[in-house]
């Protein structure tokens, strides 16, 4: 199988792409990094023993794939421009979100014209607890009835949220906004129906311009309410929890004593953690292992 010759554009989040690509030498040949020539870029090039390209003109014509991890125009960066120029050069592109729909449309048009692949990178559906949540939701969708969806998320990861919902809900066809509630500076709230299911979307719509990747209150928290209980992805990195719906038969309340044998359902736990309890949850582990592995899985797809 031919190895794909790959370059990475950007040396901030791009470092995760570098590690992901280096971990799969049988599929990818890491050629170089496109950057401004900063000290960080030079250190990355030295660590991975690759070339530094300071302009797209310097990038070889035989590159198969460029991973663009540079802020897009939506966040005041030139990532969109870089992606367009690479596509015009005949190179397939995977680009990190968030990106404005109009910018994505421009890139898709060029990719189609050139018969290339343009893909928005999305590592989140490949995270272990996200996959576990999706698997559990699919099972419950077949065994029970999804009644309501509650989501809390940061605006920077709204694109991955939609993908997670697409994979976990019976359908997301048809969006019917019903009410928008101003929640102050921290969260904005929107209610509606997605795929015919009532949904509440609470968005942490704050971005610190000097450091857009930080200061988010959370990434994702998602709860699916069913007839028999609710399933929650407590955080993007877990845990996944199932809470059975509390039901105490009226006969129990009328017994006149609590010293009785309750119905079997009363002996259920109030919640069940469905994640690996021993999973390492440090931010260091997420940064150096979890995210690069998820990026690699996204590249495989």
PLM-predicted stretches and their roles:
Residues 30, 52, 93, 117-118:
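Hydrophobic beta-strand scaffold residues
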Residues 48-110:
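Beta-loop-alpha module in the N-terminal Rossmann-like domain of NAD(P)-dependent dehydrogenases
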Residues 3, 45, 65-70, 116, ...:
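C-terminal helix-rich "cap/oligomerization" subdomain common to oxidoreductases
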Residues 71-73, 123, 206:
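Short glycine-rich anion-binding loops that position phosphate/pyrophosphate groups of nucleotides
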Residues 94, 100-164:
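A contiguous active-site-proximal alpha/beta segment in oxidoreductase catalytic domains
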Residues 159-273, 281-284, 291-292, 296-300:
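Contiguous beta-strand/loop segments that form the cofactor/metal-binding neighborhood of enzyme cores
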Residues 33, 66-67, 149:
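Receiver (REC) domain switch-region micro-motif
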Residues 1-48:
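N-terminal Rossmann-like dinucleotide-binding module
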